[in-house]
Amino acid sequence: MAAVPTGTLFSVATTFGSNITVTAVTNANPAVCTATAHGLSNGDIIEVTSGWGRANKRVFRVANVTANTFELEGFDTSSTSFFPAGTGTGTVREVTAWTQLSKVMNPSTKGGEPKTVVYKFVESDVEYSINDGFTATSYTLEFDDDDTTAGYTAMRTLTDAQTNTVMKMLMRSGAILYLPCTLAMNDVPRLQDGQINRISASFAGVNRHTRYSA
């Protein structure tokens, strides 16, 4: 069904829990993590640090919790080619607080496109191409130039710290997108005749986004 951006809410993670050690991760759909007395609950949002490059710094929703295990909802690690058995251990940390970014304007994104490598053999007059992963994803948002909002304060802090955070985009349909990222705010006001003064912030993805349907 067609959708429009109106009503979309943006937030950033401003507080994380302590690192939780993960001692095993299954090759399954979805992946099941073992972490003794982890204390997580169904629906919690976590950032993963893992020996698997395709999982490292990704963000997932927790599901089917037991005392010592939990699932990474929607994350398929069945392939031992992409996820070598026994090497996905690491840590997770829960997002414990979000700050909404208010007065957002003109959201834009770039990256995420497939990368291709073009090559040719000497004996052939035809070029070939193969896929080689994806370009880095980033978002840019503009905001009303209002330094009294909680979102401005959060972005200022994250810009100064340059630590990893998570951008959450809650669409009007109820679908949610999580992008692990670093944030950099340009708080020099942009003045334009006939427009309100505005600032901007860029969210540089550190791995692929995760999306959950409504």
Where are these regions (language model features)?
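Oligomerization/assembly interface segments of phage tail-like spikes and tubes
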Residues: 128-147, 195-210
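Exposed beta-sheet edge/beta-hairpin loop segments within beta-rich domains
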Residues: 126-134, 155-159, 170-172, 189-196
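Short, acidic/charged, Gly/Pro-enriched secondary-structure junctions
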Residues: 99, 151-180
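Small/polar beta-strand repeat architecture
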Residues: 2-7, 14-29, 35-38, 52-125
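Well-ordered beta-strand positions in beta-sheet-rich domains
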Residues: 45, 57-61, 69, 176-182, ...
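Short beta-strand and beta-hairpin "edge-sheet" elements
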Residues: 168-213
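Short coil-to-beta transition motif at edge beta-strands of beta-rich domains
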Residues: 35-52, 160-166
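Extended, low-complexity, turn-rich repeat/linker tracts enriched in Gly/Pro/Ser/Thr and Asp/Glu
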Residues: 54-55, 147-150
